[in-house]
Amino acid sequence: MMKHIPIFLFLFFASCEAQEKQNDIALQDEVVKYKFETVASGISNPWGMTWLPDGTLLVTEKSGNLYQIQKGVKTEIKNVPKVYNRGQGGLLDIAAHPNYAQNGWIYITYASSDGEGDGGNTKLIRAKLENGGLTSIESLYKAGPNTTKGQHFGSRIVFDKEGYLYFTAGERGETFVNPQDITRDNGKIYRLNDDGSIPKDNPFVGQKNAKEAIYTFGNRNPQGLAMHPETGKIWEHEHGPQGGDEINIVKKGANYGWADVTYGIDYDGKSISTMTEKEGVENPIYYWLPSIAPSGMAFVTSDKY
């Protein structure tokens, strides 16, 4: 039976003054009354959403459906690509181009079976919304090879102030294979031009066999990505194993350590690494022990709360 799940925006804020070693952000216990308004129901496992300039809300459903919501009316969008709906995979994030009003581009990530091998992996496309369906669909990036494992697809999308597109792909359960190898996809944050081409100043352009779209590596499963409204820097958060969820500021060519360093342990209680720091590895600006499984982030700029 379909569950009626209200959609609401979860806002997360973390102070940038936290010290990664002390992890000592002071949180005030404060009773705050919020009012939740249901804008749509009948969506099972909504995963990503984006607003269009006219106030239309686009929402992805993990199973593969895409909806537009206008003035409380929910309509299913046609011609959505088939997704690899397994485990954590499916129809994932969606983002409107910063200049959507001029060019009409919408960007979508999803688990796709296209490409080499059985199973699926993270794919990025762009498309336009016309007459209730997706048109002009263009494939921008497909991580590979495919795998039948069901975990760690990423895959958040964000644009920076210069118009570059960032998206994430988790390490697909290949803990000791993908994250530290820049010749392989997964366990990475990617940076592209808005048409899917690779910026000439990406950190690994010209390196032999490197995936030139990679902007950072050593990431486990990044599911939060947001641009700081004042600095313009891209922040990300990612899932650790048992413990060790992290917040990081994205830096060009940086290694975020997975799985050479971690604050967490494996799900069977065994150690993954004895190190929480290592030369050449970026330390998180904040981490959680135990894990909270952060699944999305946004900066609060409103003065209403």
Feature roles, as predicted:
Residues 19-175, 224-227, 232-240, 290-305:
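Acidic, Gly/Ser/Thr-rich repeat motifs that build Ca2+-stabilized beta-propeller blades
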Residues 3, 62, 126, 156, ...:
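Basic side chains
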Residues 6, 70-71, 179, 248:
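Short amphipathic alpha-helical segments
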Residues 2-8:
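Sec-dependent signal peptide recognition
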Residues 21-29, 89-91, 99-101, 172-305:
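Beta-propeller domain segments
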